[in-house]
């Protein structure tokens, strides 16, 4: 990326500083998903043949498995580490496996090239890193909303089940830190269900705002593409 602008190698400290891969490797699932969609788009435009599309999609599937492969290796060598330790080990292993990767986009390009050769470079046709990161971030937020929403729904269902089991049990309500009139325990629990429903509606609205694709917008002027806005 830098070689086209500078005649001398970058200072080592600056080179490490400008790399975002140690952080944005977490966007691997989203980068792969966006790359698959783009592969279908350029195949529809005649840039990839059907065989090339199949090879590209299969290669991307293998790249997407990298973190799982590292997780299996870590478990095999050190037993079953706790969640935080395991994530740190996976992160260190992934970053160390691609010291030359500038960012998640470059990482996928390098790993896909290992899998399918020069064909991987065709995937760069008609897209820029600007739109790639914009797409990845929207997918990441959307996936996070889905995960959070599922958790909230499960929590609400648990509260409803618990409320149904309390029967006519009562408890004191509180106002200004002082006990007030008695209320049903079920009603107190269901009040939290109402709060969860409010949060779910907000997440639903946020997801709708996230759910469009900025692909084909390029660095500044848009370029025509069947995927734009979908």
State where each predicted segment sits:
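A helix-coil-helix interface module used to build multimeric assemblies
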Residues: 1-75, 82-222, 226-229
């Amino acid at each position: 990326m830098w070689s086209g602008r500078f005649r001398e190698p970058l200072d080592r400290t600056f080179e490490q500083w400008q790399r975002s891969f140690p952080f944005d490797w977490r966007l691997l699932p989203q980068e792969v998903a966006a790359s698959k969609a783009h592969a279908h788009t350029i195949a529809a435009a005649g840039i990839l043949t059907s065989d090339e599309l199949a090879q590209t999609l299969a290669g991307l599937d293998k790249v997407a498995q990298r973190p799982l492969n590292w997780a299996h290796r870590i478990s095999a060598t050190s037993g079953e580490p706790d969640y935080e330790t395991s994530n740190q080990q996976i992160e260190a292993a992934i970053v160390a496996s691609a010291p030359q990767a500038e960012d998640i986009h470059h990482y996928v390009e390098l790993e896909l090239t290992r899998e399918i050769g020069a064909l991987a470079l065709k995937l760069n046709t008609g897209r820029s890193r600007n739109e790639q990161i914009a797409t990845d971030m929207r997918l990441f937020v959307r996936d996070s909303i889905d995960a959070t929403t599922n958790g909230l729904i499960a929590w609400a269902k648990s509260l409803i089940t618990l409320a149904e089991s309390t029967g006519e049990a009562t408890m004191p309500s509180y106002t200004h830190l002082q006990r007030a009139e008695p209320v049903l325990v079920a009603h107190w629990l269901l009040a939290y269900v109402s709060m969860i429903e409010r949060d779910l509606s907000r997440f639903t609205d946020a997801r709708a705002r996230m759910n469009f694709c900025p692909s084909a917008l390029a660095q500044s002027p848009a370029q025509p593409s069947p995927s734009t806005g979908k």
